[in-house]
């Protein structure tokens, strides 16, 4: 097996857990650079599996499938944050270079862990999360401070694109919402006086090289990304610098290798709060395929292959419209 510091050369197999649209875009980027791709996804007709050199159709924690993937691939990554962390652990135990590792991904898989991480490293990152409280027992609802209302109740796991969250204005609404979520562990987050939302896309290599794309300003409709504008038109240069430095601090503190996106809220007061971490190429970064020297997907390939990261230079101002199929509206 090659040394963990050696570059992985074109012609080698790179693996991706997850066969959706992000995996498909990653596959095209890897193939354009001369790599082969193995996709593990349970869907026979997965978008990435359809274009990859090899598609292993199996559950993400299928031991035989993971062993087969490990025998083929020099490095493996994940397409989305809800791939079980144990799959990444098992692949690493089988001797495969995994980027990012489960330790970084698992923080973003659980909103409780994510909020704790962001709060713990607030001083280092310079930006922390919104005021919040973990809801795990009936007594937690009783002891919610009044100033957390109105708030947004979010399930700790499996929430994305506006799913797994609801706005609550009173303790009674909170109790009812928690019942509808089947009393799973949740986070109640104070609803902030939001001015606009931005995302910071950063990439870290195995050698601790970190590069950042220009901060993007996002508009969501029904919890789903609608448009992304780059450069972000509403932030000051001081705010952008603070956001980029926070994202760089977060990716280093997670010891994370690969592409990572941090979403931030800019409040009407001018304050900034960290909303969430996405441990993968991000929808708001799709514009990089046409507007930057190096796309976010090529950067993911470079990080996995342990080769130098590319330039994040923006070659033209961009407004991206996120169009999705009717089945997902």
Model-derived segments and spans:
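Conserved protein kinase catalytic/activation segment
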Residues: 270-273
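Short acidic active-site motifs
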Residues: 64-65, 87, 139-143, 173
């Amino acid at each position: 097996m090659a040394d963990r510091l050696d570059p992985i050369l074109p012609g080698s197999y790179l693996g991706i857990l997850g066969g959706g649209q992000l995996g498909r875009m990653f596959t095209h980027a890897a193939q354009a650079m001369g790599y082969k791709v193995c996709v593990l996804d349970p869907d026979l007709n997965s978008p990435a599996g359809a274009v990859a050199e090899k598609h292993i159709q199996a559950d993400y924690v299928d031991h035989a499938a993971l062993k087969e993937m490990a025998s083929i691939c020099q490095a493996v990554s994940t397409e989305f944050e809800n791939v079980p962390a144990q799959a990444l652990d098992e692949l690493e135990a089988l001797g495969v270079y995994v980027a990012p590792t489960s330790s970084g991904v698992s923080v973003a898989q659980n909103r409780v862990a994510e909020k704790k991480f962001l709060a713990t490293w607030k001083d280092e990152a310079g930006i922390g999360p919104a005021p919040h409280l973990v809801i795990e027992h009936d007594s937690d609802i009783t002891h919610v401070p009044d100033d957390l209302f109105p708030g947004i109740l979010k399930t700790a796991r499996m929430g994305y694109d506006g799913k797994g969250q609801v706005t609550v204005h009173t303790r009674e609404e909170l109790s009812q919402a928690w019942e509808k979520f089947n009393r799973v562990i949740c986070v109640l987050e104070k609803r902030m006086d939001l001015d606009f939302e931005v995302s910071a896309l950063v990439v870290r290599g195995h050698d601790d090289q970190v590069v950042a794309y220009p901060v993007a300003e996002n508009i969501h409709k029904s919890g789903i990304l609608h448009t992304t504008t780059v450069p972000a038109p509403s932030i000051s240069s001081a705010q952008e610098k603070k956001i980029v430095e926070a994202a760089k601090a977060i990716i280093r503190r997670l010891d994370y290798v690969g592409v990572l996106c941090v979403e931030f809220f800019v409040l009407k007061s001018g304050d900034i709060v960290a909303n969430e971490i996405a441990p993968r190429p991000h929808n708001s970064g799709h514009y990089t395929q046409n507007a930057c020297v190096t796309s976010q997907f090529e950067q993911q390939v470079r990080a996995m292959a342990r080769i130098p990261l590319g330039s994040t230079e923006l070659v033209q101002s961009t407004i991206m419209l996120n169009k999705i199929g009717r089945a997902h509206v």
